[in-house]
């Protein structure tokens, strides 16, 4: 999951070296925190949050395969 989010984010931004993904595991879910450079924040979120929503949808679909619940937070 973490690797998938990192790959997607790096393909969207201008500064792929500054992409960081951290994973926080809870009792029932996994929280993936995506950190990008401030100038790339708009590219990851997209107009009206469309790209962010698409990223979350892809990650959730991959999580369902593994019977897990994943939340993506963009920081």
From Swiss-Prot:
Entries under Gene3D superfamilies matching the protein: 3.30.300.20
CDD domains: KH-II_YlqC-like
Keywords assigned: Cell shape, Cell wall biogenesis/degradation, Chaperone, Cytoplasm, RNA-binding
One of the GO biological process terms: peptidoglycan biosynthetic process
Any one annotated GO CC term: cytoplasm
Subcellular location: Cytoplasm
Ranges where the KH domain occurs: 29-75
InterPro entries hit by this protein: KH_dom-like_a/b (IPR015946), KH_sf_prok-type (IPR009019), KhpA (IPR020627)
Pfam families: KH_KhpA-B (PF13083)
Molecular function as annotated in GO: RNA binding
Family named by the database record: Belongs to the KhpA RNA-binding protein family.
Subunit-level organization: Forms a complex with KhpB.
Role this protein plays: A probable RNA chaperone. Forms a complex with KhpB which binds to cellular RNA and controls its expression. Plays a role in peptidoglycan (PG) homeostasis and cell length regulation.
NCBIfam families: PRK00468.1 (NF001748)
Protein name per the record: RNA-binding protein KhpA
Lineage: Bacteria, Bacillati, Bacillota, Clostridia, Eubacteriales
Gene transcribed to yield this protein: khpA
